[in-house]
Amino acid sequence: MSRPRRRGRDVHGVLLLDKPQGVSSNDVLQKVKRIFNANRAGHTGALDPLATGMLPICLGEATKFSQYLLDSDKRYRVIARLGQRTDTSDADGNVIEERAIGFSATDLELALESFRGTTQQVPSMYSALKYQGRKLYEYARQGLTVPREAREITVYELQFIRWEGDELELEIHCSKGTYIRTIIDDLGEQLGCGAHVIYLRRLQVAIYPTERMVTLEQLAALAEQAQTQEHSLSLSLDSLLMPMESPVIDFPEVNLPPVVAGYLKLGQAVQAANAPLNGMVRITEGDAHKFIGMGEIDGDGRVAPRRLVVEFPV
């Protein structure tokens, strides 16, 4: 029996969506998928409904490499409300404690310094991490607290922007798995007044340029202009996409002659000139350096296929 035909276009690449406030990451993912009429789509790390900013959305074959963006560094701009702590550590939650603001500028700098570098962070109960098969926020909504292991995070840069009254603004460049809400909650406790997030914007993921972000409104306008005709859609929308290999562009490249690449596509490990001694590599084919997927250097120094792109007829 033949496989059922997938609905939608074979469109491949990464869209840098400027996520609006007040909607979930999955909601905007589905909207982008419909606008592009794409057969496959996936985002690369959810943003809270309150948050805005860069949400890379992988389409088609690019979804195979979304994990590499989940593992990448992020940069955020955050504004905290001082003097109030909420159950979710952001403005979407309920205020559970109010305290006076009584710290000095010196106290603030000392507190900020303690978050720079590599530290251990206990995730919020209001997160999508799982405990015994259920997401933490499902327990939290039932008023339950379950054990969470501290996880290692790295804050590469924590820049003070401003402190005015009960508002504190920071810019944070951090490693994967860092919860900005938790940093703000922990900072509020160190300062003795409590704090929660009232504004959060993701400025950057990996090395993707901020100026390449597009809004849902811009996408919808282009799609309407194209009158949903497939050829017009590709001309109007596909030019907005980053290449499908962009999530793995920082990995070492191994370029294979077409004949050798053919064996790799059949699942065989192959010898390659100038390959690194170990680790994951980005594999390209021929003089055009066409991206064909990711491989790993095996114990014999050969390139073994790990995640390859399916080739579609043009």
From Swiss-Prot:
Signal peptide: none
Annotated catalytic residues: 48 (nucleophile)
One Pfam family it belongs to: TruB_C_2
Protein function: Responsible for synthesis of pseudouridine from uracil-55 in the psi GC loop of transfer RNAs.
Record key words, sorted: Isomerase, tRNA processing
Recorded superkingdom: Bacteria
Protein name, UniProt field: tRNA pseudouridine synthase B
Top-rank EC class of the record's enzyme: isomerase
UniProt-recorded Gene Ontology molecular function terms: RNA binding; tRNA pseudouridine(55) synthase activity
Positions in coiled-coil regions: none
GO terms of biological process kind: mRNA pseudouridine synthesis; tRNA pseudouridine synthesis
Assigned protein family: Belongs to the pseudouridine synthase TruB family. Type 1 subfamily.
Residues where substrate binds: 43, 76, 179, 200
PANTHER family attached to this UniProt entry: PSEUDOURIDYLATE SYNTHASE TRUB1, TRNA-PSEUDOURIDINE SYNTHASE
